[in-house]
Structure formats: C-alpha cells, structure tokens
Amino acid sequence: YIMYGGKVIWLIDQVFADMDSLNSKYNNNTILATAKDLNLDDQFFRYGVRFNKDLVLDLRSAPIPVVNGKYGTQVKTQLYPWPYFPFLFSKNDHPINKNLDVVKAEFAGSIDLIGSGEVKKTVLLASSDATKVMKAPTRISLNMLSFEPPVQQYNKSDIPIVVLVEGEFESVYKNR
C-alpha cells in the first residue's frame, strides 16, 4: 500500500505507561514504564525516522486531578501539572498544523530524524523549551508531585514528537 503511494498515519507508542495502573492503591501509585518491541524499527529507519524508547517530560504540561484529602464525606482534589502530559507546539505553517493551538500529549516519546535524503521530513509538533527525556525502563510515581520539579534538569528544547514524512518509499524487504 505504501509502495504504491498510499497515505498512512502511524501512531506509534514505543513505551507502555498507563494512568489507570498508576492510580492503583496496590502499587503505591508507582509504575514501571517499559519499552515495547513493535518490530517496526527497520521499516521506519529506512523511511528516515527513529521512534525512541523514551518519555518526554515537560514543565509546560497538562494538569491532572489528585486526591489530597477529604472534607467531611467529600473527596478533595487539586490539579497539579503532570510533566508526562506535555503540551506540544507547532513551529511552522504547514497546512496540517497551520492555526493549530497547543496540543496535549500523554506519555509521548521522541522521534529522531535520520539519513534517508530521498524523503522530506517535517516536524509538525515538538516539545517546549523546558523539556527532559527519560529512557525506558523508568519509574513513574505520583509522589513526584509532592516536590518542586528540578528545573535545571529540564534543559532540552524542541524535541520532535509528531513528524510528517513525504516522498517515495522503498520496501523494507528490498534486497533481502
């Protein structure tokens, strides 16, 4: 399909992390985010992209509600910024993302643009200028919300999260 000019949207999730598991009282609000082997690395490498087995954390992120007490019979919740839900920004005027506002991602991974000069690659959405990348496996805990984030560790910027790849693609099975 791709070799004959078909158009495909790939939504790749290289790391398993889940808020449902994180909210469980049985695991002390902690999970281990682990890498998934989707067996697609060769194909995407040939197309000029690498989906990294990591998580992008950003100080500019969406808040999550956290239960932090009770008021009588009412549960009291408060919103805390959750670095694992980064806001993504567009830095270009491509027709796909022109006039697009900030986009919220959940447990997003980074993408590297590599070699393969035959195809055109455009970063559609990227992280902010206050970003940190954590390789999988990594521990994720709601307890981190109790502390002020170490701002000096969020020293990366514009990490590609959404990429458009255009052109003519060769089969990953060619010459095999």
Where would I find each of the regions flagged by the language model?
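Acidic, S/T/G-rich, low-cysteine, solvent-exposed domains in lumenal/extracellular/periplasmic regions
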Residues: 1-176
